[in-house]
């Protein structure tokens, strides 16, 4: 192989080679980027401006992966206090970067996606809205249970593996959730509960899931087991509720499949209610074990407030809430508009949305179980003319058929809430081709200490 440097031959790198490199950038997943003799390497726990000795882990045709062996120069943006366990598991894959620089990184992710994918550089991307206290914010935890060193342990898997690293302080989870996980772990050890063995397909307890209402403080504990028959449930419940009076719901889920999915189909309420209750922007919500509910309540409120402000609605306006879930965004809009029409393909979520509307005395929000494309076609035939279509899709973004159907409704505005800048930029490009102009872009940090970024954008019909 001949180096780009004229006339100089270089040795092909192989696994376990150690080379000195300078980190020039961060990938969209927060890995350090190093360039060496035509190769691009991705290195965890490495920041721009740092100079490191890198051990080669894998080499592909033009790229590879490495790990830090030694640092020669550290970035001033490095957070030296972070526990490396949070990086190894991916719990906090940006925890080694100062929070101010995390917010800058996330703004850049949005800018880069808009420019590289949609060719947009003339619209201002606002500074990322961040948290005052960017730790211990998650209101939900899902932790695997495995045997480590002969005993039942809870924690997180090492990245790209199913090797459990025991953890007691999860860094970004509500501290009461951490306490309940640790108490349950210790209690089930005393009852000699067998943890799940993924290789042998043996054992009883697969996962512990905990939800906590940010404002209500109510807690739900879900024990995911491989079979219906379990341990001495009454004794376990008694001790948990005695230690944690805020626990108002204990549920068993049975998952007997060889799968990475956390939940199986069957749920059984062992104690208390089927749901917990919490509030967001003044509305109350009943939250089940399966409900999609934003894990960062404080920042979800800021996200929704941004979407409401961008939409700039009045009492005469009609809003279509596509991907309406359990109604959190749509019901937040309902107070300021004539009507909200929500559509969601998951029937259980639609029932939750309808119940949440009733719970809050909201009578101008209507939710249906359907595809958005079919629902919008039906509403158009019924003469419903939305001022705004609100979209909050999964990471894969919008389908072409959805984009076409939404444009056919002729809304003056489309407010797009995104959890993936790349698919957002792709969809914006398509909307621009169909007569909509990008007007506003606001990143919001719902997931501090991680590379994930949410964004609200406003598209206006030209």
Swiss-Prot record:
Alphabetical UniProt keywords: Methyltransferase, S-adenosyl-L-methionine, Transferase
Annotated ranges, domain TRAM: 12-70
Sequence positions that bind S-adenosyl-L-methionine: 294, 323, 344, 392
Superkingdom: Bacteria
Assigned EC number: 2.1.1.-
Catalytic residues of the enzyme: 419
One biological process term in Gene Ontology: rRNA base methylation
Gene3D superfamilies cross-referenced by the UniProt entry: 2.40.50.1070, Nucleic acid-binding proteins, Vaccinia Virus protein VP39
Gene Ontology molecular-function annotations: rRNA (uridine-C5-)-methyltransferase activity
Entry similarity comment: Belongs to the class I-like SAM-binding methyltransferase superfamily. RNA M5U methyltransferase family.
PANTHER family (alphabetical): RNA M5U METHYLTRANSFERASE (PTHR11061), TRNA (URACIL(54)-C(5))-METHYLTRANSFERASE (PTHR11061:SF30)
Name of protein: Uncharacterized RNA methyltransferase SPy_1346/M5005_Spy1098
Species annotation: Streptococcus pyogenes serotype M1
Lineage: Bacteria, Bacillati, Bacillota, Bacilli, Lactobacillales
């Amino acid at each position: 192989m001949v180096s780009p440097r004229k006339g100089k031959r270089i040795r092909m790198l192989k696994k376990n080679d150690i080379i000195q490199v300078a980190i020039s950038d961060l990938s969209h997943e927060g890995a350090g980027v190093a360039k060496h003799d035509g190769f691009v390497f991705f290195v965890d726990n490495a920041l721009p401006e740092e100079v490191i000795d890198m051990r080669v882990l894998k080499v592909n045709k033009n790229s590879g992966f490495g790990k830090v062996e030694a640092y020669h120069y550290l970035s001033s943006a490095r957070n030296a206090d972070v526990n490396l366990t949070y990086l190894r598991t991916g719990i906090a894959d940006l925890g080694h970067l100062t929070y101010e620089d995390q917010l800058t990184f996330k703004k850049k992710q949005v800018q880069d996606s808009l420019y590289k994918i949609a060719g947009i550089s003339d619209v201002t991307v606002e500074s990322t809205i961040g948290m005052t206290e960017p730790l211990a914010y998650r209101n939900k935890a899902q932790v695997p249970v495995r045997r480590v060193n002969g005993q039942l342990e809870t924690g997180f898997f090492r990245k790209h593996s199913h090797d459990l690293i025991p953890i007691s302080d999860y860094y970004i989870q509500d501290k009461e959730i951490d306490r309940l996980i640790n108490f349950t772990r210790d209690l089930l050890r005393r009852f000699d509960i067998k943890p799940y063995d993924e290789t042998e397909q043996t054992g009883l307890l697969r996962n512990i899931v905990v939800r906590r209402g940010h404002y209500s403080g109510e807690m739900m504990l879900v024990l995911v087991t491989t079979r219906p028959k379990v341990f001495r449930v009454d004794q376990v419940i008694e001790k948990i509720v005695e230690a944690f009076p805020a626990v108002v719901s204990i549920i068993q889920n049975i998952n007997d499949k060889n799968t990475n999915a956390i939940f199986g189909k069957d749920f059984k309420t062992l104690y208390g209610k089927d749901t917990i209750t919490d509030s967001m922007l003044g509305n109350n919500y009943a939250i089940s074990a399966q409900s999609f509910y934003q894990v960062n309540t404080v920042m979800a409120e800021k996200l929704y407030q941004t979407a409401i402000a961008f939409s700039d609605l009045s009492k005469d306006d009609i809003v279509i809430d596509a991907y309406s879930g359990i109604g959190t965004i749509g019901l937040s809009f309902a107070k300021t508009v004539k009507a909200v029409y929500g559509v969601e393909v998951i029937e259980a979520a639609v029932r939750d949305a309808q119940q949440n509307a009733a719970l809050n005395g909201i009578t101008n929000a209507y939710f249906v179980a359907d595809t958005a494309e079919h629902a919008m076609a039906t509403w158009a035939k019924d003469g419903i003319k939305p001022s705004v279509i609100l979209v909050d899709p999964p990471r894969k973004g919008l389908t072409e058929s959805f984009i076409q159907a939404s444009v056919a409704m002729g809304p003056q505005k489309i407010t797009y809430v995104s959890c993936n800048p790349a698919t957002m930029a792709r969809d914006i490009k398509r909307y621009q081709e169909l007569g909509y102009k990008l007007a506003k872009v606001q990143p919001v940090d719902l997931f501090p200490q991680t590379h994930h970024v949410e964004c609200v954008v406003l598209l206006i019909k030209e």
